[in-house]
């Protein structure tokens, strides 16, 4: 929405963008606080990536907001949170309790964060580092492939 509004009024689009970022950070902070307070590894689901890593979506529209420092900070925040969560999530999925059938659709979210970080990085940084691009691309392809294979095995 903010992106489209910038075509008519840059300031209005920027205000909406900043408000959305602040609201997202508040919701993500609340989510992290409440989940950390009573943390149980077996309660972790791939959908837990949405609040902390979803902020990287702001990078995709950030290039039109003329705020490169904020866009870079948002990317780094989302990417660091993803790097913290990924090993814990993989450990939970491999060694934790089996995900209940009603929660299996949430497993498909596993493929999104690496792809989102790649899209955010390519959009936020005008001269992306090829090593970072290669790493994020390989990670996105690997995890998405694992999700597809797992979905096939789950259905069978």
Task: Describe each PLM feature range.
Residues 130-156:
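Extended, compositionally biased non-globular segments
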Residues 20-37, 56, 79-93, 112-116, ...:
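Hydrophobic, membrane-facing alpha-helical anchors
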Residues 33-54, 71-74, 90-115, 154-156:
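Cytoplasm-facing juxtamembrane segments at the starts of transmembrane helices
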Residues 2-78:
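Membrane-interface helix-loop-helix junctions at boundaries between adjacent transmembrane segments
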Residues 77-139:
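Aromatic-anchored, glycine/proline-accented short structural segments
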């Amino acid at each position: 929405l903010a992106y489209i509004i910038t075509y008519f009024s840059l300031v209005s689009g920027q205000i909406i963008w900043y408000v959305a970022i602040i609201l997202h950070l508040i919701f993500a902070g609340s989510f992290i606080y409440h989940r950390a307070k009573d943390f149980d590894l077996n309660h972790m689901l791939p959908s837990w990536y949405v609040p902390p890593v979803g902020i990287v979506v702001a990078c995709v529209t950030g290039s039109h907001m003329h705020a490169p420092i904020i866009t870079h900070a948002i990317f780094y925040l989302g990417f660091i949170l993803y790097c913290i969560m990924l090993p814990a999530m993989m450990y939970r999925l491999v060694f934790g309790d089996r995900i209940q059938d009603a929660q299996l659709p949430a497993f498909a979210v596993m493929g999104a964060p690496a792809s989102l970080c790649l899209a955010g990085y390519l959009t936020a940084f005008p001269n992306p580092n090829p090593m970072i691009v290669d790493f994020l691309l390989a990670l996105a392809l690997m995890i998405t492939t694992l999700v597809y294979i797992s979905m096939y095995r789950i259905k069978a």
